Amino acid sequence: MQVTQLNLFPLKSAQAYSVQQVFVQAQGLSFDREFMITELDGTFVTARKDKILYQFSVLPIPQGIVLCYQQTQYVVRYVDFKQMQPCEVWGEVFLSYIADTQVNHWLSSIFQREVQLRWLGVESQRQLTAMAKPMSFADSNPILLCSQKSLHQIQQWAPVEVTMAQFRANIVIDGQTAFAEELWRVIQIGEVMFEFVQHCTRCVMITRDLQTHELNPHVEPFRTLKTHHTNARGKPIFGIHLIPQNSGIVRVGDRLQVIRSEEI
């Protein structure tokens, strides 16, 4: 088995930025979910509610990032983030940097309400108690791995076209058997050892059309997963969450080795 895709999501809930190699650190993949848009009170903005986020993409540059929206580009420098204020992701409150007024004014004009751009900073102030490690702006775990073999099985079940992009995986592998990854507990890819945290439970976000940005009227492929592939609590699952055990580089084409798995 080997890695076929590496995807970063520099801005939470926005478009993927695909790379051929990535540096893995304690908080996850470097440059993944290091930025997010929040309300004025620091509450995170998500594409579950604001589909406009799917129209944003981010390009890295040495001094910061380029925010791209439709035909507009806006250069945001790291030095533009000076003030730290509390922010919130799924009820967890921690400090992050706020972009300057000009950046936030531009974003607010797009969202048609006042919002802010946040940056984790060089060192994340967020730390999940269960992990005892720094964490990005990701929902609950730093890295998501999905298998193309598992996707193929979902495509066989679903009455609509389903793509890997809908599942927003960081690491995509070719796989050998559908859903075999759900039994892995420790794996190695390239220079990095990863430990299984939990299966990825899915929400209606996977039903959003990546071209029109509208939710599928038949709630697919969420409904298909709900019918065919759930955890013990009846929640649809696809992919596994991982935490890195060390730092190092992972590349497209790297071999995946299963170090330890759970017996059926």
Language-model regions, residue ranges each:
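Metal-cofactor-dependent catalytic cores
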Residues: M1-I264
